[in-house]
Amino acid sequence: MAEEKIYDITIIGGGPVGLWAAFYAGLRGMTVNIIESLSELGGQPAILYPEKKIYDIPAFPQTTGAELIENLLIQLKRFEDRVSIHLKEEVQTFKKTDGIFTIATSKGQHLSKAIVIACGNGAFAPRPLGVDNEEDFANNNLLYNVHSLDQFAGKKVVIAGGGDSAVDWANHLDGVAESVTLIHRRDAFRAHEHSVELLYQSSVNVMTPYVPLEIKGENGHAQSLTVQRVKSDEVVELPIDALIVSFGFSTNNKNLRNWNVDYKRSSITVNAQFETSQEGVYAIGGAAEYDGKIDLIAVGMGEAPIAINQAIQYIEPDGKNRPVHSTSLIEE
């Protein structure tokens, strides 16, 4: 594939912050190209926790990952005539010549006047449970993310983990599953205090500190999980219909070193205008790093218009690019 069209702004990453940035760029009259390495848009909320309840999005007392992405896509559809989407493409390098970036991907190349990086911390993969025969049961009834709470109705569910996702899934499944057991290798959980309070008020069987030892099952179907109490000989075999491993996800921004921008670990250093060290390239959301950074979707949503407006000013330095309110830009 060779893309000859020159876009105003290319957004690397199709998660919630990238989708919002694309909408805002469309609102400002820009042509936009979204390049996403995965097979669908939405990033982690869509793929890892579509049914997980989210409470910290402004004006939404409660939503889910799936609902959030669905609404962002509906919003973006308004500008479908000026927004292109390329899925399953990994951005490898980009280089500017005569004011135009040539973006090389795993499928070909794209041309753009400016780039906004919104790829979070890069590609992600689940951290394993760490027992010998784990792969025998993976993605059967041993799961690393939850797509539907209904799939656990009436089942004996064991969850391994101690962070926000593990505690949240335990709380959400309480009352849906026949039983829920949460095991964690430490006494204290790393989740939000309120979520932990709800956990101990629920009927979830909390087992701490325990570590997984062995999965038993037949024909790829896990039937029990054996756990051992830390610093003890006590061993417990837990019957399971479903095992959810919630040890978090490892991320990989391996191509970052080829993008010619300053970065620390897996995040790109930006200034107050979300400019990177390379002129015409901006970074927002989980991809951006600056003093006082808070890694929340809501924060990334606020960063996006700033970066887009800076990109427009870069593209059209002599243009009338002063930001205006959306009510002045959209006529129903």
UniProtKB/Swiss-Prot annotation:
Gene3D superfamilies: FAD/NAD(P)-binding domain (3.50.50.60). Pfam families: Pyr_redox_2. Its cofactor is FAD. Binds 1 FAD per subunit. InterPro entries: FAD/NAD-bd_sf, FAD/NAD-binding_dom, Fd--NADP_Rdtase_type_2, Ferredoxin-NADP_redctase_2. One of its GO terms (molecular function) is ferredoxin-NADP+ reductase activity. It is an enzyme of class 1 (oxidoreductase). FAD binds at E36, Q44, Y49, V91, F124, T327. This is Ferredoxin--NADP reductase. It comes from Streptococcus thermophilus (strain ATCC BAA-250 / LMG 18311).
